Amino acid sequence: MRFPKPLFFLLACGMSLPTCASTQAPPSRVTVLYDAFGGGAGLTRDWGFAVLVEYGGKRILFDTGNNAEVFAHNVRALGIDLKNLDFVVISHRHGDHTAGLNYLLTVNPSVKIYAPKEGFGVFGAALPGTFYRSDSALPRRMRYFDGRPPVELTFGTPWPAAHFVWIDSVTEVAPGVSIIPTVSQTPGTLELRELSLALRTPDGLILIVGCSHPGIETIVEASARVANHVSLILGGLHLVTTPDAEIERIATSLHDRWHVDRIAPGHCTGEPAFAALERVFKARYLYAGLGTTIDLP
């Protein structure tokens, strides 16, 4: 029997047009919500960083910017629904990545937030009650907790109601989505814990980085625990005060030694580093200013 074309289409779709439409793959992309360059469409520039990552059907907020009001303004201007997030990743404790939590938690108070695990961290933390050296010869009044400490000591946070999950090892948090912790050895940020987001794609890993305080090469090296090849690096590389010679070395190393395919620098990468990376990566340099959307494989 031959059916009219519209009827045949409905039968092929199980008599339901919405069902057919729902078979389309969800978008895979990164949208820059917060940065100090770019903009347009009523967006407000400010020093800080935040992106929305859409990948594998997940909606992931990575960092929240420097000012809750600016973050809220940009989110609304871009039509982003923060109630519809699968989880949040906070790269590190600095205020230009965390301040927007104050707005986020008014909109989505129960969202899961992955954050670095630190002994006395701003995201809250816990240590064994015996983490300190004790002296049993002291009188009780001079001993912590009268010499009988709790099994675990928990430490406060400016966001006590938030659902923080602390990360201190490479962790797959969704299919194809991993969080990679690294530790800074740089003077000024010594021992700072930082999380980067790694997405598996057919072309290799996509690394979303906040500030790269531990060093972008250190982060790329650590990503080998997830996959051997990095297709794209997006975010802050913390070269904003780095001398030209070191910028040139790092840009060349990312391209020639680590064989990174594409780079989309933002935030604290710095203007001289933008120029150097564009020279080295040429057509594989991607602009990633405020309001930009970059499609992922």
Segments predicted by a language model, with ranges:
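Bacterial N-terminal signal peptides
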Residues: 8-18
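Boundary at the C-terminal end of the N-terminal hydrophobic targeting segment
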Residues: 19-23
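Conserved beta-strand hairpin/beta-sheet module of binuclear metal-dependent hydrolase folds
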Residues: 29-78, 190-208
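Divalent metal-coordination and catalytic microenvironments
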Residues: 53, 63, 75, 92, ...
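Active-site metal-binding motif and surrounding structural segment of the metallo-beta-lactamase
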Residues: 69-118, 224-234, 238
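Cap/insert and terminal regions of metallo-dependent hydrolase folds
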Residues: 97, 112, 196, 202-291
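Metallo-beta-lactamase
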Residues: 119-195, 286-297
